[in-house]
């Protein structure tokens, strides 16, 4: 899900055997550059025999379709290898604005989605593994303080059905003072995110989309304040792995 700057380091996990064909689904929450910048450096794009299905919902497409955005990103003057010249097979899919009762099924997983309140549009994805009964919801960019009630209701439904999600990974970029000064920027305070997690019934909360202006000391202090309010919560860290049947591993 998404193609940030760390994506190239994920390639060995997505396709451990360089000689074998790989079939990978990439979901894009939206088309802002911080969620796309790692895609040109993904080694799988340059490996013949690889298939990448790249999908985004119509709620994110104020700038165009998935194919039009990728052709802009992968080509002159931004990148030396043109989209049409990629050795991999890249299939672009434009999803409906919301999944409703029709999840996308892939590799034993069920994927549902709903729109988020963010400039230009954004999408929250829910991933369920019916065989284990585990689930997560990822909502990277959202300004909940001024969200339309219907959008909040749809997101709540996404988090609760078919069962309350085990993990909510969500935007908690600001503190209370900063979020007030940056109304309209499309992000949420950590305290509002904690309230949201309780409202939607998420078992655990992991905050992401940290403010680039915040250093590690600031983030650690924020995590302590967050855990005083919601002990099951934490801040996401680079390289963190989470077993949905256990706690986070650092």
Q: Where are each of the predicted segments found?
A:
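Binuclear metal-dependent hydrolase catalytic cores
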Residues: 1-137, 145-146, 220-250
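Cap/insert and terminal regions of metallo-dependent hydrolase folds
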Residues: 135, 143-238
């Amino acid at each position: 899900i998404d193609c940030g700057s760390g994506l190239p380091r994920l390639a060995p996990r997505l396709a451990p055997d360089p000689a074998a064909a790989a079939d990978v689904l990439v979901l894009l929450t939206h088309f802002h550059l911080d969620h796309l910048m790692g895609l040109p450096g993904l080694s799988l794009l340059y490996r013949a025999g690889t298939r990448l299905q790249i999908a985004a919902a119509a709620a994110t497409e104020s700038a165009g379709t998935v194919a039009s955005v990728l052709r802009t990103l992968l080509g002159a003057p931004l990148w030396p290898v043109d989209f049409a010249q990629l050795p991999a097979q890249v299939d672009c899919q434009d999803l409906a604005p919301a999944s409703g009762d029709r999840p996308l099924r892939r590799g034993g997983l069920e994927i549902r989605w709903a729109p988020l309140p963010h400039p230009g549009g954004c999408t929250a994805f829910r991933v369920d593994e019916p065989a284990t009964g585990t689930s997560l919801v990822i909502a990277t960019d959202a300004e909940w303080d001024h969200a339309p009630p219907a959008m909040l209701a749809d997101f709540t439904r996404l988090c609760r059905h078919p069962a309350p999600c085990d993990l909510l990974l969500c935007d908690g970029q600001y503190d209370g003072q900063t979020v007030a000064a940056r109304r309209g920027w499309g992000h949420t305070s950590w305290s509002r995110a904690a309230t949201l997690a309780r409202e939607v019934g998420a078992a655990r909360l992991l905050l992401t989309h940290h403010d680039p202006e915040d250093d590690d000391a600031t983030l650690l202090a924020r995590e302590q304040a967050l855990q005083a309010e919601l002990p099951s919560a934490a801040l996401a860290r680079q390289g963190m792995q989470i077993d949905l049947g256990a706690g986070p591993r650092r």
